[in-house]
Amino acid sequence: MASKQNEEVVLSRLVRLFRQSPLMYLSESNIWTYRGDESLKLTLVDVVSDHQNFVDRAETILVAEQFELPQSFFPLAFTGWHDVDLAFLLPTLIADLEKREKSLQILRDHADGIVGQRGSAAGKTAELVREAISAVEGHLDMLRQQEKRLKNNVTTTAP
C-alpha cells in the first residue's frame, strides 16, 4: 500500500512541477501574445506543449489508479511579468527549468524505488519521469540557443 501512495506522491509532484512553472504561467496568461521575438515565442510554445503533455499523461495515470488529482496555483510574483519582454525573462526561465530538472532527477530516484516494490504498475510512472528529464534537457538546450541568438542579435545591431 505504501508504494502505491509513493507513486501518487511522485505523479502529483510531477504534475505540480510542470503546472506551477513560470513557463506554464506565460502560456496560461497569454503573455507571449504581446509583441516580441517570434522565434523565442515559438520555442516557448513548443516547450510548454511538451510540459502540458507530461501533465496530461501523469494525470491519466493518477485517474487510472484512482488517485486524487493535485491542486496547483501560480505564485503571485508571476503577475509582475506582464509588462516584461520575453527576452528579458529568458534567463529566469532557464534558471527555473534547471531547478526543475534537478527536482525531476530526485523524482526519478523515488520512482525507481517504487518500481522495485510495486513492479510494472509503477513502471509507467518511472518511464514518464525519465521522458520528462530527457525532454527538459532538450528544452534547456533550445532555450540556451535562443538566449545566445538574442545576445548575438543585440551585439550585431548595436551602434
Regions found by a protein language model. Name each.
Residues V9-V55:
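N-terminal leader/targeting helix
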Residues A58, T125-P159:
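Short, contiguous alpha-helical
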Residues M1-V9:
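Extreme N-terminal tail/first-helix region
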Residues M1, N30-R35, A77-W81:
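A short small-residue
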